[in-house]
Amino acid sequence: MDTFQVIILALIQGLTEFLPISSSAHLILPAELLGWEDQGLSFDVAVNTGSLLAVVIYFRHELWNMFTAWIASIFKGKQSDDSKLAWWIILATLPAVFFGFMAKDFIETHLRSAEVIAVTTIVFGLLLWWADKMSHQDLTVYQTGWRKALLIGFAQALALIPGTSRSGATMTAALMLGLSRDAAARFSFLMSVPVSLGAAILVGKDLSESSLPIDYQALTLGTLVSFVAAYLCIHYFLKIISRMGMTPFVIYRLILGAVLCGFIFL
């Protein structure tokens, strides 16, 4: 890949990973418009690592408090709001892990298509709009509870379907269950840490077993660009939803889905 392609793809990954707009839908567009080939496993690992570092650094205080409280709950039996939140995040991760292993081959074979991505981009955009407008949103992230956490976890598993958007599915479920917009976004961001880490490890394992050449300069640039884009995305997204809600992202998803349908069916 040349430098321009690295920057564009890393920007797409960083900007769309944490927005409820589907990163897979956006990664189709460069291929359709510019004829770019698949970027390969090594680049996937690099840009995912950049996004993971962004959320870890942005929420470093919350994550550290959760980690220390979680350790205390195990070894000292001390329960706190942060330890409960840590356990809920772990619980919410389990459905995606289970269904990821069980349905990986089926998804890769039958659902990873432009048609599926176009349809899910529109359908789950409408669900996000409904959840944002119709649900009663007053719970904080510390009021989630294990039942709601598990249901949000199943929504995250549903996002294994390309075009759904992990952030979009989890935020939609959280809003439907009564979490505030800020709480829904924060819970979704925190949930991304174990999932992204696990995915990076699995893809990294596949990469280590591959004999393909590695362009370390491109990977370094991709990681850096993805990190900066994702960090800024998280910061400004939290500000936008506090003022405008999810409507801008719903409109964007509908337009994007229509554009994809145009490329596919016209």
Swiss-Prot record:
This is Undecaprenyl-diphosphatase. The keyword Zinc does not apply. Its main location: membrane. It catalyses: di-trans,octa-cis-undecaprenyl diphosphate + H2O = di-trans,octa-cis-undecaprenyl phosphate + phosphate + H(+). Its EC number is 3.6.1.27. The chain crosses the membrane at residues 1-21, 39-59, 87-107, 111-131, 149-169, 183-203, 218-238, 246-266. HAMAP family: Undec_diphosphatase. It is found in: Cell inner membrane. Belongs to the UppP family.
